[in-house]
C-alpha cells in the first residue's frame, strides 16, 4: 500500500490574532516560523466566539465549544445557549430531573446541595444558572438549600468572585432560606488531570465539613483568602457557617445538583461523589449515599446519573464521516487537551471510529504551567512527526495546549515562552509535512495569549478573548482562503483538500479555492 500524504490540522490552543501590540504575547515572542507562514502562505482570520459557534452574542469561545464546532462542521448550539433559553422560556423550572431531585429532598426532609463554578465566565458554567437553581429549589419548597461555590479567576479576572458571592448571599437572603455552605477555588474542585489530592480538598469541605479555614459568610471567607495572597482560582477550601448554624455537609439521602455544563472539569469531583468503585483517594467512613445526583449535561458516558440536558445528536461529524469512507485518522494531544481532540471533536461522543488512532502524551506534573511553558510540546511533536512520516494517515488532528494553558496564568513572560515553544514545534511539524508532500491547516480554537492584561480591571487578563484566530494553508499547491469564516468552516475545508464531498449535515463552507 502506498504511503498516504496526510492533511494535518494543527490547533494552536489559545493563539488569537490582535493588531494591538501591547500586552500581546504573540507579538512579543520570537516566532520566525509563524511570521514566515503569515507572509508566504494563504491565510485569513476566522471567528471563534459568540453566535459563530452557537454561543450568546459577545460570549468568548472556549476549547470545548471550539473543538466541537471544528469537528461538527456546523454551528452547534451550545449547552450555555440551551440552558439560557430554558430559563427564559420557563422550561428550566420544570426540568424533570431537577424536579425529581428537589422534590425527593423535600419529601424526605433532606437537603438540596447545589454545586458549580460561580462565575460570569460562561465557559464551564454561568452564575445565573446557579441563582436560577437556588430560586427553583426554594420556590418548590425545599427548606435546606446549600450552595457549594467553586471560584473561577481563570475565565474571569483573577479577583472577581466577590460580586458573585455577594449576589448569592443576597438571593438567599431575599428567599429567606438557604445559604452558601462552602467556597473553594476551581484549582481544587475542577481538576481534570487526576490530581486527586486537589480534588480531595474540595470533596472534604463538602462531605465532611473539614477544611483548613472557616468563615461566617462567603464574602468574609473570600476576603480572608485574598489576605493570604490567594486569587479566586486558588482559594483554599473554606467552610462557611454562621455563629448559630451547623456546618452544612452532603449526607445520606440528600440531593446534589451539579450546575456545570462543560463536562471535562466536572468529571473527577462527580466520580468522587457518586462512583461506588472510586479509587482516586480514600473517602473514609463518611462517604454519603446521595439519593439523587443530577448532571446538568452528560459529563461522561460511564457516569451513571440523571442528565438534565442530554446531548443532542451530532451525526456525521468529521471523524465519523471520514471513517465511514474508509479513511484513516489520528488524534494527538497532551493530557490537558486530549478530551478536546477526541470526545469534543467527535461531537461529545466517546466512540473511537474504525481507522482512528489516538496518542495521549502526559502533561507535565507541575503546579501551574507557567513553571514549564513548553509543557509537553516537544514530546507531542516527536510523536506527531513520526505519525506524519509513517504514511498511515489520511488526516491528523493535533492540539498544542501551551498558549491557552499558560495564557490562563496571566503571566506575560511565561506566555511569551509558550508561544515560542509552539513556534519551534511548528517548524518541526511542517518540515515533516513537506517531506511527505502532505498539507497542513493551522488555526486555533479561541484566543487568549494575544491579550494578557485587562486595562479596565487593572488585572492580568487570564480568560479567553473574543478576537479572531489565524487560519493558514501550508502546501505545495497554491490556493486562496476566503474571508468571513468561522470554526464551522474548518472541517468542510479539510474535506475539500482530501477531495471528499461534504455531507449534508455539515452546513459550514469550504474556505479554500485551489489554483491550477
UniProtKB/Swiss-Prot annotation:
Say which domain of life the source belongs to. Bacteria
Q: Which cofactor does it need?
A: Mn(2+)
InterPro entries recorded? Alkaline_phosphatase_core_sf (IPR017850), BPG-indep_PGM_N (IPR011258), Metalloenzyme (IPR006124), PGAM_B_sf (IPR036646), Pgm_bpd_ind (IPR005995)
Q: What enzyme category does the UniProt record give?
A: isomerase
User: Coiled-coil stretches, from where to where?
Assistant: none
Pathway the protein contributes to: Carbohydrate degradation; glycolysis; pyruvate from D-glyceraldehyde 3-phosphate: step 3/5
What Pfam families does the entry give?
Answer: iPGM_N, Metalloenzyme
Explain how, and how many, cofactor molecules are bound.
Binds 2 manganese ions per subunit.
> Which reaction(s) does the protein catalyse, per the Swiss-Prot or TrEMBL entry?
(2R)-2-phosphoglycerate = (2R)-3-phosphoglycerate
Annotated active site: 63
Q: Which CDD domains match?
A: iPGM (cd16010)
E.C. number(s) listed in UniProt? 5.4.2.12
So where does Mn(2+) 1 get bound? 404, 408, 464
Could you tell me the Gene Ontology terms of the biological process aspect for this record? glucose catabolic process; glycolytic process
Binding residues for substrate, per the UniProt record? 124, 154-155, 186, 192, 262-265, 337
NCBIfam families under this entry? pgm_bpd_ind
Which family, according to the similarity comment?
Belongs to the BPG-independent phosphoglycerate mutase family.
Instruction: Say what the protein does.
Output: Catalyzes the interconversion of 2-phosphoglycerate and 3-phosphoglycerate.
Quaternary structure annotation from Swiss-Prot or TrEMBL:
Monomer.
Protein name in UniProt:
2,3-bisphosphoglycerate-independent phosphoglycerate mutase
Organism field: Cellvibrio japonicus (strain Ueda107)
Amino acid at each position: 500500500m502506498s504511503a498516504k500524504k496526510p492533511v494535518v490540522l494543527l490547533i494552536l490552543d489559545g493563539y488569537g490574532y490582535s493588531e494591538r501590540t501591547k500586552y500581546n504575547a504573540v507579538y512579543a515572542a520570537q516566532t520566525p516560523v509563524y511570521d514566515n507562514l503569515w507572509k508566504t502562505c494563504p491565510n485569513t482570520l476566522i471567528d471563534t466566539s459568540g453566535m459563530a459557534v452557537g454561543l450568546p452574542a459577545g460570549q468568548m469561545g472556549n476549547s470545548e465549544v471550539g473543538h466541537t464546532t471544528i469537528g461538527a462542521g456546523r454551528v452547534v448550539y451550545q449547552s450555555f445557549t440551551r440552558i439560557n433559553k430554558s430559563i427564559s422560556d420557563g422550561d428550566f423550572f420544570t426540568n424533570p430531573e431537577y424536579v425529581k431531585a428537589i422534590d425527593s429532598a423535600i419529601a424526605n426532609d433532606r437537603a438540596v446541595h447545589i454545586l458549580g463554578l460561580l462565575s460570569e465566565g460562561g465557559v464551564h458554567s454561568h452564575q445565573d444558572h446557579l441563582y436560577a437553581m437556588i430560586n427553583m429549589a426554594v420556590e418548590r419548597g425545599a427548606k435546606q438549600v446549600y450552595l457549594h461555590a467553586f471560584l473561577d479567576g481563570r475565565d474571569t479576572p483573577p479577583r472577581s468572585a466577590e460580586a458573585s458571592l455577594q449576589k448569592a448571599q443576597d438571593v438567599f437572603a431575599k428567599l429567606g432560606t438557604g445559604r452558601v455552605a462552602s467556597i473553594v477555588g476551581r484549582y481544587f474542585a475542577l481538576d481534570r488531570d487526576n490530581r486527586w489530592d486537589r480534588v480531595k480538598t474540595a470533596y472534604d469541605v463538602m462531605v465532611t465539613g473539614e477544611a483548613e479555614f472557616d468563615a461566617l459568610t462567603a464574602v468574609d471567607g473570600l476576603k480572608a483568602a485574598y489576605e493570604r495572597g490567594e486569587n479566586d482560582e486558588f482559594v483554599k477550601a473554606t467552610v462557611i457557617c454562621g455563629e448559630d448554624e451547623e456546618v452544612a455537609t452532603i449526607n445520606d439521602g440528600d440531593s446534589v445538583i451539579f450546575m456545570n455544563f462543560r463536562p471535562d472539569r466536572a468529571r473527577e469531583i462527580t466520580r468522587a461523589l457518586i462512583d461506588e468503585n472510586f479509587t482516586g483517594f480514600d473517602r473514609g467512613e463518611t462517604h454519603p449515599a446521595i439519593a439523587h445526583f443530577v448532571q446538568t449535561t452528560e459529563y461522561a458516558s460511564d457516569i451513571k446519573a440523571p442528565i438534565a440536558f442530554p446531548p443532542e445528536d451530532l451525526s456525521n461529524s468529521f471523524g465519523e464521516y471520514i471513517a465511514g469512507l474508509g479513511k484513516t485518522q489520528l488524534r494527538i494531544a497532551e493530557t490537558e487537551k486530549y478530551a478536546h481532540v477526541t470526545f469534543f471533536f467527535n461531537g461529545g461522543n466517546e466512540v473511537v471510529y474504525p481507522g482512528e488512532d489516538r496518542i495521549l502524551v502526559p502533561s507535565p506534573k507541575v503546579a501551574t504551567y507557567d513553571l514549564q511553558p513548553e509543557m509537553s510540546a516537544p514530546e507531542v511533536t516527536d510523536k506527531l512527526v513520526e505519525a506524519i512520516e509513517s504514511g498511515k494517515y489520511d488526516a491528523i488532528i493535533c492540539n498544542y495546549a501551551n498558549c491557552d494553558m499558560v495564557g490562563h496564568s496571566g503571566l506575560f513572560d511565561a506566555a511569551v515562552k509558550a508561544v515560542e515553544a509552539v513556534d519551534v514545534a511548528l517548524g518541526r511539524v511542517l518540515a515533516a509535512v513537506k517531506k511527505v508532500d502532505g498539507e497542513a491547516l493551522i488555526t486555533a480554537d479561541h484566543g487568549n495569549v494575544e491579550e494578557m492584561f485587562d486595562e479596565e480591571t487593572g488585572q492580568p487578563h487570564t480568560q479567553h478573548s473574543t478576537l479572531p484566530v489565524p487560519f493558514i494553508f501550508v502546501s505545495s499547491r497554491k490556493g486562496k482562503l476566503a474571508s468571513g469564516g468561522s470554526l464551522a468552516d474548518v472541517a468542510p475545508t479539510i474535506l475539500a483538500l482530501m477531495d471528499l464531498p461534504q455531507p449534508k449535515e455539515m452546513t459550514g463552507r469550504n474556505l479554500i479555492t485551489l489554483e491550477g
